[in-house]
């Protein structure tokens, strides 16, 4: 039996993966991956956009800690990009960030590519 993973995918429209920083997505679609199957869990509104926090600089380490708290049950973050310092900080906290650079990916295709990068498909 493979270990269960909880995956957060950044999205602004509920259909496609957000093209831009993971931390500025309007919401996250949360999925569980276990025994080769993906199951949708829920949609979570992002309360930590730079605008909401009043942060002007990207890659602020405070935001990485707050993102980890907001998505504390997630093992993998899937999105277009994330600042290097934040990505390193999250990896120190046990979160794997999977960057996917193609614009317009459906959430399903983003998940498929992320699982492939994790060696799970």
Which residue ranges define each predicted feature?
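Non-catalytic interface/targeting segments
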Residues: 1-62, 100-121
